[in-house]
Amino acid sequence: MREVISIHVGQGGIQVGNACWELFCLEHGIQPDGQMPSDKTIGGGDDAFNTFFSETGAGKHVPRAVFLDLEPTVIDEVRTGTYRQLFHPEQLISGKEDAANNFARGHYTIGKEIVDLCLDRIRKLADNCTGLQGFLVFNSVGGGTGSGLGSLLLERLSVDYGKKSKLGFTIYPSPQVSTAVVEPYNSILSTHSLLEHTDVAVMLDNEAIYDICRRNLDIERPTYTNLNRLIAQVISSLTASLRFDGALNVDITEFQTNLVPYPRIHFMLSSYAPIISAEKAYHEQLSVAEITNSAFEPANMMAKCDPRHGKYMACSMMYRGDVVPKDVNASIATIKTKRTIQFVDWCPTGFKVGINYQPPTVVPGGDLAKVMRAVCMISNSTAIAEVFSRLDHKFDLMYAKRAFVHWYVGEGMEEGEFSEAREDLAALEKDYEEVGIETAEGEGEEEGY
């Protein structure tokens, strides 16, 4: 089996996690108490969904996941919520005091005390796997726990499980909507370790997803639940091929191979289509070509970043539902002819396609319409550097005055770490710039397309 362990860190990671597991349970017909009426083999069968769920002798399905937070309130909601019987109590780890939006507290003082317990639980889950494939790590980097404890955990996972791939789903601060003054500090300190210790990081940002909810789903005032359910659809599409059987299945390591041209250039944009409310879907014909086009629409990107300002290095298209390879190839051929969608000249093919026959599932009472087919696109584009330069600018404004720095130093950080992380990000922006530059040899061949 190719098992995957999910790790949800901090409030953002846990709430996205709740939405994901809710959706996975619906997709597999697993009830909130972990029973699965359709599963006839008691004990660990070799079913595809066993990559995400382990089975007990009593026929109960338990997610291979750990939830951790430095303060109890968010995890207590899981402990008392609808799915309280789904998780083993040991999988829900919470501390007593929170990180107070401070990376240093999450990474050094308070995180240090809890991280060994977390690794111990992760070790137990890993021992329960026959062939662990890797980790999915969910966190947001604006706060203290997701950024500090999240990066501490990634560093320790690299030591303990060096060769296993780590995919991060990371919620980055939005350009306009802010939840903390020190977001730029936390996210840059955290990205510094995401650079080294994740293999692929999918960037999400709340503002972009708010706008999608408003525009496509007519939700006037989207809540975090609306946002998280949308994120859950993306994550579900990415992992569908691990959990179901299909024509072109995609492994976690395959993402890496196809999307990451250089180790540092691994921050991905994602989009999902069709995002449409039930009232509208009734009147629309959502063909493969249409959903493929909307996946490339800048407005449908899940991070505030315009892919028209950069070039694509690689795209991975994960289709699910009623889709055949012939339609996909035709749609992609059309995309390639469009002048607005540019690829770097050193990567002529640029597409990785996965097809899974399991149609998308929607949460009852949710916002999304039930559709026959959907696509999720994960793309590596040089435009993502916009996100970093925006954060770097905000970081510089504050750091020039050393504002708020004493809170970090007081928790045992050194001021040098700020400049080190900032330099690392400056280098990253430079890397993205260089990747997008035309290669010298390519200049004479422009006409030959």
From Swiss-Prot:
Quaternary state and interactors: Dimer of alpha and beta chains. A typical microtubule is a hollow water-filled tube with an outer diameter of 25 nm and an inner diameter of 15 nM. Alpha-beta heterodimers associate head-to-tail to form protofilaments running lengthwise along the microtubule wall with the beta-tubulin subunit facing the microtubule plus end conferring a structural polarity. Microtubules usually have 13 protofilaments but different protofilament numbers can be found in some organisms and specialized cells.
PROSITE patterns recorded: TUBULIN
Presence of the UniProt keyword Cell wall biogenesis/degradation in the record: no
Compartments, record wording: Cytoplasm, Cytoskeleton
Enzyme class: hydrolase
CDD domains reported in the protein's UniProt record: alpha_tubulin
Main location class: cytoplasm
N6-acetyllysine sites (modified residues): 40
PTM statement from Swiss-Prot or TrEMBL: Undergoes a tyrosination/detyrosination cycle, the cyclic removal and re-addition of a C-terminal tyrosine residue by the enzymes tubulin tyrosine carboxypeptidase (TTCP) and tubulin tyrosine ligase (TTL), respectively. Some glutamate residues at the C-terminus are either polyglutamylated or polyglycylated. These 2 modifications occur exclusively on glutamate residues and result in either polyglutamate or polyglycine chains on the gamma-carboxyl group. Both modifications can coexist on the same protein on adjacent residues, and lowering polyglycylation levels increases polyglutamylation, and reciprocally. The precise function of such modifications is still unclear but they regulate the assembly and dynamics of axonemal microtubules.
SUPFAM superfamilies in the record: Tubulin C-terminal domain-like, Tubulin nucleotide-binding domain-like
GO molecular function term, any single one: metal ion binding
Gene Ontology biological process: microtubule-based process
Alphabetized UniProt keyword annotations: Acetylation, Cytoplasm, Cytoskeleton, GTP-binding, Hydrolase, Magnesium, Metal-binding, Microtubule, Nucleotide-binding
Gene3D superfamilies: Helix hairpin bin, Tubulin/FtsZ, C-terminal domain, Tubulin/FtsZ, GTPase domain
E.C. code: 3.6.5.-
Cofactor: Mg(2+)
Functional summary from the UniProt entry: Tubulin is the major constituent of microtubules, a cylinder consisting of laterally associated linear protofilaments composed of alpha- and beta-tubulin heterodimers. Microtubules grow by the addition of GTP-tubulin dimers to the microtubule end, where a stabilizing cap forms. Below the cap, tubulin dimers are in GDP-bound state, owing to GTPase activity of alpha-tubulin.
InterPro entries per record: Alpha_tubulin, Tub_FtsZ_C, Tubulin, Tubulin/FtsZ-like_C, Tubulin/FtsZ_2-layer-sand-dom, Tubulin/FtsZ_GTPase_sf, Tubulin_C, Tubulin_CS
Entry binding sites for GTP: 11, 71, 140, 144-145, 179, 206, 228
Reactions this protein catalyses: GTP + H2O = GDP + phosphate + H(+)
Site note Involved in polymerization, residues: 449
Active-site residues, as the UniProt record annotates them: 254
Protein name as annotated: Tubulin alpha chain
Family: Belongs to the tubulin family.
One Pfam family from the record: Tubulin_C
